[in-house]
Amino acid sequence: MPQYIPIMLNCEGWRIVIVGGGRVAERKVSSLLAGKAEIVVISHKLTPWLKSRHTEGVISWFERGYIEGDLEGARLVFATTDQAAVNEAVIMEATALRIPVNHAGDGEQGSFITPSMIRRGKLIIAVSTSGAGPRIARSLCHEIDKQYGDEYETYIDFISNVRAFIKELVPDGSQRQSLFKLLAEMDILTEIREGNFRPWSEEEITSWISEYREV
C-alpha cells in the first residue's frame, strides 16, 4: 500500500477535470468549490445537484463521454465513472501528462487520494486511513464533527485577523512570537460559546498589541 503525504493545495484558478457526473463526482465537486478552481465535469448526465451548479455557472459541463485530450491544461484530475475502461483511460492520460489523478473506485490506481474532511471556515480537519478503510475515516470524521462546532469558525477568524495585525505592526521576530503565544492562550472560545464575544475593532487590536508587545 502506498505511503501518502498530507498536503494542503491552493487551487484557485486551477483547471480541475472530473470525468463522471454521478454521486461520487458530486462529492468531489462539493469539496472543491471552496478552492475557487475552474471545475470541468465531463459526463453524458449529471445529478440534479451538479446540474444546479452548472446552471449557476459554478462548474463547466461537457455533455458527452471522455475522449483522449480532455485533460490538456488540467492541474488535477478525478476519474469517477462506473466504467472501468474509461477510468483506466483517464488514469493513463493523466499519468502520461504528469497530472495528479485520483481514481475514486481504487485509490491505488491513481497518484493521490482525498481524505474525509470537516470544514469550519478557515479550519480544516482532514482524516484518512490511507485508503485502508474509507468508512472508518468517515466514522472518525463524524465523531470529530461533534467536538468542533461552528464556534471554531468565529474563533479562527478572530485569531487570523489579530495575527495579520501583529505581522504588519511588529517587525521584531521574538516580539511577534510572544504575541502569538499570548493570543493562542486567550480563552476566546469560552467567550464565544457563552455568547459574550464580539469581534475586536482595529483600535482594540492595535491597543492590545501596544500593551503586550513589550511583555
Region spans (language model):
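Short loop/edge segments at beta-strand edges and connector loops
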Residues: 43, 61-65, 105
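Hydrophobic, well-ordered beta-alpha structural blocks that scaffold small-molecule cofactor pockets
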Residues: 1-45, 50-53
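Glycine-rich, highly charged phosphate/nucleotide-binding loops
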Residues: 52-72
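Hydrophobic beta-strand scaffold residues
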Residues: 39, 61, 100-101
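Residue-level detector of alpha-helix initiation sites
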Residues: 23-24, 85, 131
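E1/E1-like adenylate-forming module used to activate ubiquitin-like modifiers
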Residues: 103-153
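ADP-ribose/adenylate-binding Rossmann-like module
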Residues: 76-82, 87-113
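An accessory alpha-helical subdomain
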Residues: 131-215
